Design a protein with these regions (language model features):
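Active-site-proximal, substrate-binding regions of enzyme catalytic domains
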Residues: 2-132, 138-149
Length: 149
């Protein structure tokens, strides 16, 4: 297998909040030999949802605790380049968004738009990798497909 084939087999998942509040083990499963990118808006949404008394609130709290524990064990360099997890990497996006490639009507304050743009940037910056947006939000999937993400 060539190096480019190996890179293509490795996937980069950009995750949305909806997947994390519906599947508590999503991060552990997705990082197995892959890279998971956690956009800053997802951290903000988890923070808002963690106080809910519903099952989604419980899952958000569980996910936030897992992320906190994972970050606590990571070095400063790993926080910058990706935290090793299950043979893959967990990367935290800083929240700074390059608006190059933003479309007419793009709203940087709308989490879905910011996450889709981030996935689009990862696709362009890492053409050798398969970049996949993971969400349970049908409207977000439709918007992402319209942007060829």
């Amino acid at each position: 297998m060539s190096q480019s084939d190996a890179a293509r087999d490795r996937k980069t998942y950009v995750v949305d909040t909806s997947i994390l509040v519906s599947a508590p083990d999503a991060l552990q499963n997705l990082t197995t030999n892959n890279t998971v990118v956690l956009p800053f808006p997802v951290l903000q949404e988890l923070d808002r949802r963690r106080t809910a008394t519903s099952g989604a609130g419980y899952t958000a709290r569980t996910t936030v605790r897992f992320l906190d524990d994972t970050q606590t064990r990571a070095s400063v360099e790993e926080m910058r380049t990706g935290i090793p997890l299950n043979g893959g990497l967990l990367k935290f996006h800083s929240g700074t968004l390059d608006l190059t490639g933003a479309w007419p009507g793009f709203n940087a304050t709308y989490a879905d738009d910011a996450i889709i743009l981030l996935a689009d940037h990862y696709q362009r910056e890492h053409p050798e990798e398969q970049v996949i947006l993971v969400t349970r939000d049908a409207a977000m999937r439709c918007k992402a497909r319209a942007r060829a993400v």
